[in-house]
Amino acid sequence: MSSNASHRELAEAWLSEDPDPVTADELRRLLAACDAGDPAALADLTERFTGSLEFGTAGLRGILGAGPQRMNRVLVRKVTAGLAAYLVASADDARPRGVVIGHDARRNSRVFAEDTARVLGGAGLKVFLAHRPWPTPTTAWAVTDLGACAGVMVTASHNPPAYNGYKVYWGNGAQIIPPHDTGIAAAIAKIGRSDQLAMPALDELRRAGSVVDLTEELHERYLAKVVELRASPGIDGRSLVIAYTPLHGVGALSVERGLLLAGFPQVHT
């Protein structure tokens, strides 16, 4: 079998389990271009279906698109299934302690977060799901505050808009370190088709108490802890005018509210 033929078979198998009409259509168009003999399309197909994005201490990060070398719903579901298997194998109380899931405002971040919640819930793990986009440190802090066994943050941090990512935090609120990264990667490698995973609807999981939506109450507690850490609490900030830009990030609400709680009411974003 030629390399092109094997990559095409991998692509067709991927297409058969892709739940996202956008990436499915993208892959169909790529295959059509390959059939027409487009050398750039053939090279693109080969790159997308040679190996996969590697899971490490920083989790996953890649360009959005179809195929295992891109960030997409198929990959997120498989990675989450591997994470769930590793957590359950690592701790007897992983299921009741649960996993915190946060996300930023990038393209597909909410969808990836909800898919993550459904896969974890289907594996019997309790899920604490952010109700809106929020900064990464909020997720890490929530892991320790809620006593969860892990946290997932859907974000690509400073990368350009075409990217998205998937960060994992351990029960201590810190980004995972060895041997957890390789253990999770090994568990991911054992996962089969993503469309065969147990993925109850979110509403069903909410009714069962398996998914709990995290509201502004948790965010307020987080900001209160942040304000406690200010270096000079005696400063009168009422007359100080502050301009802030989130630079396309999700920090605006946190910064505005945090500064207000710290005594700096004149914040412009």
Segments (PLM) and residue ranges:
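Cofactor-/ligand-binding subdomain signature composed of acidic, glycine-rich
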Residues: 2-78, 190-197
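Gly-rich Lys/Arg/Thr-decorated short loops/hinges at beta-loop-alpha junctions or inter-strand turns
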Residues: 54-70, 97-100, 118-122, 195-214, ...
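Glycine-rich phosphate/diphosphate-binding loops that line cofactor/substrate pockets in enzymes
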Residues: 79-99, 230-238
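Glycine-rich phosphate/diphosphate-binding loop of Rossmann-like nucleotide-binding domains
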Residues: 73-80, 102-122, 240-269
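Ferredoxin-reductase
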Residues: 14, 18, 94-171
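Short, glycine-/Ser/Thr-/acidic-enriched flexible segments
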Residues: 60-62, 67-69, 106, 134-135, ...
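Phosphate/oxyanion-binding active-site loops and adjacent basic polyanion-contact surfaces
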Residues: 71-81, 131, 135, 215-225
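Gly/Ser/Thr-enriched, mixed-charge loops and adjacent short helices
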Residues: 14, 18-22, 44-53, 164-269
